[in-house]
Amino acid sequence: MTELTRIPLAGVIGSPIAHSRSPALHGYWLKRYGLKGHYIPMDVAQADLRDVLAAMPRMGFVGCNVTIPHKESVIGLADIVTDRAALIGAANTLIFRKDGKIYADNTDGTGFTANLRQNAPAWQPQSGPAVVWGAGGAARAVIAALIEVGVPEIRLANRSRARADALRSDFGAKVHVHDWVQAGNILEDAMTVVNTTSLGMVGKPEFRVPLDALNPKAVVTDLVYAPLRTRLLVEAEAAGCRTVDGLGMLLHQAAPGFERWFGVRPEVDEETRAAVLAA
């Protein structure tokens, strides 16, 4: 097969992978824009990761998304790592360059802010503190993005205090760590509230942080998107807050990779959202 006729391949690697909505999303975009290409989900064990990444370009892959548990590991296997991916310590988007080098980026943070700007257009991140629950890879991406858009203070609470303290040491003085038992007491005057934990996800423990101190002017978002309407979002909406579900972050973080692999910047709109939910 010549370079002129090769159909570009992309995909998502992780383990497990059956739950991923990425194939439905990229498949929809390929069809919508009439593009030649395929997007393939691959269940890759940790022990096979290095060999799989080495083989993918030879198989015609131009890049891939990366999900749990490989987002941290691929940083050490990439030749070029963007500053934001290095700061976050994880990559979700790989590009296999023609010179043989693997380029790693993290678009989770920009996906997060794009989701809020689209679905809460009045959001003013500079207007007050942000509360972030959780201290994993998603929290790192969110905190990096919040700092970039000018949030003056970030109040961080995590069930493991040590992980939160480690995150603060990486991101600096804007991040203030609080014990998990205080997770509901740090909401007063917060203008942005973000759950990055798995609490409230299907099959996980329920989200039970008390929201009595929630500022009704706050924008509240939950990165969980299964279910779309989590307990946090239902209670925050009842308190008068603008709420944003987590599906939009998934859609927006995918757009830069799709553009690099297939040459078209895809729209993230209601039609896209409906197609992914229907899959």
Swiss-Prot record:
Q: Which InterPro entries match?
A: Aminoacid_DH-like_N_sf, NAD(P)-bd_dom_sf, SDH_C, Shikimate_DH, Shikimate_DH-bd_N, Shikimate_DH_fam, Shikm_DH/Glu-tRNA_Rdtase
* Residue numbers binding NADP(+): 83, 134-138, 223, 246
Binding annotation for shikimate: 20-22, 67, 92, 108, 225
Instruction: Give the positions the UniProt entry annotates as the active site.
Output: 71 (proton acceptor)
What keywords were assigned to this record?
Amino-acid biosynthesis, Aromatic amino acid biosynthesis, NADP, Oxidoreductase
Identify a single GO molecular function assigned to this protein: shikimate 3-dehydrogenase (NADP+) activity
Catalyzed reactions per annotation: shikimate + NADP(+) = 3-dehydroshikimate + NADPH + H(+)
CDD domains from the UniProt entry: NAD_bind_Shikimate_DH
E.C. designation(s) = 1.1.1.25
Q: Which GO terms describe its cellular component?
A: cytosol
Pathway assigned to this chain's UniProt record: Metabolic intermediate biosynthesis; chorismate biosynthesis; chorismate from D-erythrose 4-phosphate and phosphoenolpyruvate: step 4/7
Question: GO biological process: any one?
Answer: amino acid biosynthetic process
Q: Which family does it belong to?
A: Belongs to the shikimate dehydrogenase family.
Q: What does this protein do?
A: Involved in the biosynthesis of the chorismate, which leads to the biosynthesis of aromatic amino acids. Catalyzes the reversible NADPH linked reduction of 3-dehydroshikimate (DHSA) to yield shikimate (SA).
Q: How does it assemble?
A: Homodimer.
Matches recorded under NCBIfam families: aroE, PRK00258.1-4
Name of the molecule in the record: Shikimate dehydrogenase (NADP(+))
* Origin organism lineage: Bacteria, Pseudomonadati, Pseudomonadota, Alphaproteobacteria, Rhodobacterales
Gene that this polypeptide is encoded by: aroE
